Each structure stands twice: as structure tokens, then as C-alpha cells.
């Protein structure tokens, strides 16, 4: 899994195209346990980009029924038919309107491989000054975000299995906060942020109800501020 030092220069500067390509994962063990009811032991970078390893929460089955478990996967879903990992540079977000038909995502959607991506904050470019300025967006109440996502498993030529995940996005045209990000003429998008009471409902929902959870988070529940990128860390995360 690549680290920040391997990123292209434009990405090291903190601005990338696309929707949510950069976020801060939840790294604190107690916050993972408190807000997501899972234990996680893998180290992760302080910021995540496509191709990095980061935690996600999925449903597991044991003798007592369903439960949540934390796993570590690549940010950017790798479909089982892909020949290599490069496709993950383009599959870190899945549009909710077309996720059921796009080859990269339709199997995960059809088979209900839903997950929750724990994030302290996400980063988006604000163009109000005439140039892209990176801003941090987070929950106003101090809780981490639980972002609706899909996960998949990919087996490489060496037989090793790698997990990966993507964030689901929805239209945000007219959203009081999210309309401030990306270029003025771009369609406005936002990740689908789940409320805590909906975590298990999202993971357990019948297939026909999956889209019921992909709704806009109210602007009053979020806050945003400029957050210029710091010099990159060389920390790497493993998904082995």
C-alpha cells in the first residue's frame, strides 16, 4: 500500500479531482469502540487517499447471529475481475444513482456488501477565492462520521486476498454547505453520512431498502474550515 511520499505532486499539495478522495480515518481505539462498537488493531495513516489502507466496518456472522467487525482495506474498490490494483485510483467513490449498473460496483451492490467508513473528517476543495483551497468538513457534535460504503475482496496472482472499499455519494446541489465545494460549474456531491442509530439498519437492510439510507446530512450537523495540507508523512498502512 502506498504512502504519502508516493503521491503525485498535485495530490501532495492537497487538492485532487473527484468527490471525496482525501479523509481522516478514525485512528483512536476508544473512539472506534465507543462510536462503532468494534475493536481495531491495524495501524493506519493520519490521512487517507486512494490506494491507502484504512479501516471499515462490515457485518459478520457468528454463532450468535450478526455482529459488526472492523477490517482494513484499500480505499478504492477493486472488483474481483480486475487484473491489478490500479483501478482503485478511480473507484474510491460510487455514485448512488448508478452504483447498481457500473461494472466496478454492481456486484458489491447486488450482493449487499455494505460497510461503514469511519472518518473524523473529509477534505474538499473550496473555490470561492478563485483557486482551490482545501477545507476540512466534520460533524459539529464532535462525533466521527459513519459514511455509507461498499466493500469487496480481490485475489491477486499470488493468491493473496485484499479487501477494498468505496464511499457512496449523493447529489448535493443546493445543499447550504456542500454547494460551496468543487468548481462553480461542477455538479455538487457529498458522501452519504449515516446517523448512529442507522448503522446496523444500513448493514442489515433488505436490498430493496438500501437506497433509503443514502440521504443528505443536514448542513447544521456539519462544520467546515480551511485546512491547508501539512508536509506529507511517510507512514504506510498494511492490508495484508
Protein language model features and the residues they cover:
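Short linear sequence motif anchored by a di-proline
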Residues: 2-240
Amino acid at each position: 500500500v502506498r504512502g504519502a511520499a508516493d503521491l503525485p505532486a498535485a495530490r501532495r499539495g492537497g487538492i485532487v479531482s473527484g468527490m471525496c478522495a482525501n479523509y481522516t480515518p478514525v485512528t483512536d481505539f476508544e473512539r472506534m469502540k465507543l462510536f462503532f462498537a468494534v475493536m481495531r488493531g491495524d495501524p493506519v495513516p493520519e490521512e487517507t487517499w486512494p490506494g491507502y489502507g484504512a479501516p471499515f466496518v462490515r457485518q459478520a456472522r457468528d454463532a450468535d447471529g450478526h455482529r459488526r467487525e472492523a477490517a482494513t482495506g484499500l480505499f478504492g474498490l477493486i472488483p474481483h475481475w480486475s487484473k491489478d490494483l490500479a483501478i482503485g485510483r478511480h473507484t474510491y467513490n460510487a455514485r448512488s444513482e448508478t452504483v447498481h449498473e457500473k461494472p466496478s460496483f454492481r456486484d458489491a451492490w447486488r450482493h449487499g456488501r455494505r460497510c461503514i467508513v469511519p472518518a473524523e473528517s473529509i477534505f474538499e476543495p473550496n473555490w470561492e477565492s478563485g483557486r482551490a483551497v482545501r477545507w476540512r468538513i466534520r460533524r459539529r457534535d464532535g462525533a466521527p462520521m459513519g459514511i455509507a460504503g461498499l466493500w469487496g475482496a480481490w485475489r491477486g496472482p499470488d493468491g493473496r486476498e485484499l479487501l477494498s472499499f468505496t464511499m457512496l455519494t449523493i447529489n448535493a446541489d443546493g445543499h447550504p454547505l456542500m454547494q460551496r465545494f468543487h468548481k462553480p460549474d461542477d455538479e455538487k456531491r457529498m458522501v452519504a453520512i449515516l446517523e448512529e442509530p442507522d448503522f446496523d439498519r444500513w448493514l442489515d437492510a433488505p436490498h430493496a431498502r438500501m437506497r433509503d439510507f443514502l440521504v443528505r446530512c443536514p448542513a447544521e450537523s456539519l462544520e467546515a474550515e480551511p485546512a491547508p495540507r501539512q508536509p506529507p508523512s511517510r507512514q504506510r498502512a498494511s492490508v495484508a
